[in-house]
Every structure is written in structure tokens, then in C-alpha cells.
Curated annotation (Swiss-Prot):
GO cellular component, one term: endoplasmic reticulum membrane
Pfam family, one: CDP-OH_P_transf
Species for this entry: Homo sapiens
Name of the featured protein: CDP-diacylglycerol--inositol 3-phosphatidyltransferase
Tissues of expression: Detected in placenta (at protein level). Widely expressed. Higher expression in adult liver and skeletal muscle, slightly lower levels seen in pancreas, kidney, lung, placenta, brain, heart, leukocyte, colon, small intestine, ovary, testis, prostate, thymus and spleen. In fetus, expressed in kidney, liver, lung and brain.
Gene: CDIPT
């Protein structure tokens, strides 16, 4: 079999498209909320397709998994930076949210790699029950991730407009009410991510030290 070009696998090509759409979104964020949010959500929507393509074409790779996670983290972080500019009074909240998201996923990924997992989504079934559900139930994973991204996207749109009226309430405001609990739950799971990964790393350190004695 000739050498395969991992960088040109279909899921990775989708990943590159996600990055392009995200950059277009960031470019339009200061001036064109509907255009920016459309490209941002399109980038997020493609996240579901690259996973399906990887499984259907047997093209799952470590590079693809890393690309996927980094795109997710960087996209959310850039949106939160913009929100901090639009809502300066809530800057601390956005800073904490960014830090928690990046730190929890990075430490969880690193601990998974050190333990020998091929992906941060490969969960030891004897581990944390919340993370087990989060990573083994695709509906739960999709709902939490999509709801979290939609919350921040709606918060961005809400700065410019209430949105079309549904009765006497703007659509964007209504969407914020619905997605806020999901975003809060996602943040709590990030805390669990961080604590569980820290405990895993500490256990690995303890095991290594025991071997040296």
C-alpha cells in the first residue's frame, strides 16, 4: 500500500474548512453579527461531520483528533474574547470560562495520552461516571457542546439585537434562557474534567515514584 497522506484525509480536510469558516467569522464579528454568527455556527456544525467521515472512511487519526479539539478550543476562546470586548463588565467571567475550558481539556488530553489512550474521548469505564456518560453518549455530548456554543453565540447576537419577537420576547433572549443551563452544566463538567485529570496525573506520578523506590 502506498504511503497515505494523513493531512489529506477527508475528516482533516473538513477540519481545515472549519478553521477557514471560523477565521471568516472572527473577521466579521466587529461589524456584521449575522454573517459572523452564521460562519461560526457552520464551523461548529461541521464538527459533527468530520467524526462521521472518520468512522465511515476508517480515517480516524491522532492528528485529526488533536486538530478537532484545538479548533473547538480556539474557536470558543476567540468568541469569548469578542464577548469580553462587548460586555466589559463581564470580562472576568469570560476569562475564567476561557481558562477553565482550555486547562481542563488540555490536562485531560495530556493525562489520556500519558496513560496510553489513543484519544481523549476513550474513557476508562471504571473512571468518573459523569465523564463516562459525556463521552460515551453521543446525544449527551452533542447537546452539551452545541448548547454551550449556541449560548455564547446568542449572547454575541443579543448585544446587537433582541432578535425577532416571539410573542413579546425576542428570539435571542429566549434562546439565552434555554441554553444558559446547558452552558452552566458544560462548565461544571469542565471542572470535573480538570479534577479527574489532575487526580489521574497525580496517580501516575505516585506510581512512577513507587517504581523508583
Amino acid at each position: 500500500m502506498p504511503d497515505e497522506n494523513i493531512f489529506l484525509f477527508v475528516p482533516n480536510l473538513i477540519g481545515y474548512a472549519r478553521i477557514v469558516f471560523a477565521i471568516i467569522s472572527f473577521y466579521f464579528m466587529p461589524c456584521c453579527p449575522l454573517t459572523a454568527s452564521s460562519f461560526y455556527l457552520l464551523s461548529g456544525l461541521l464538527d459533527a461531520f468530520d467524526g462521521h467521515a472518520a468512522r465511515a472512511l476508517n480515517q480516524g487519526t491522532r492528528f485529526g483528533a488533536m486538530l478537532d479539539m484545538l479548533t473547538d478550543r480556539c474557536s470558543t476562546m476567540c468568541l469569548l474574547v469578542n464577548l469580553a470586548l462587548l460586555y466589559p463588565g463581564a470580562t472576568l467571567f469570560f476569562q475564567i470560562s476561557m481558562s477553565l475550558d482550555v486547562a481542563s481539556h488540555w490536562l485531560h488530553l495530556h493525562s489520556s495520552v500519558v496513560r496510553g489512550s489513543e484519544s481523549h474521548k476513550m474513557i476508562d469505564l471504571s473512571g468518573n461516571p459523569v465523564l463516562r456518560i459525556y463521552y460515551t453518549s453521543r446525544p449527551a455530548l452533542f447537546t452539551l457542546c452545541a448548547g454551550n456554543e449556541l449560548f455564547y453565540c446568542l449572547l454575541y447576537l443579543f448585544h446587537f439585537s433582541e432578535g425577532p419577537l416571539v410573542g413579546s420576547v425576542g428570539l435571542f433572549r429566549m434562546g439565552l434562557w434555554v441554553t444558559a443551563p446547558i452552558a452552566l452544566l458544560k462548565s461544571l463538567i469542565s471542572v470535573i474534567h480538570l479534577i479527574t485529570a489532575a487526580r489521574n496525573m497525580a496517580a501516575l506520578d505516585a506510581a512512577d515514584r513507587a517504581k523508583k523506590k
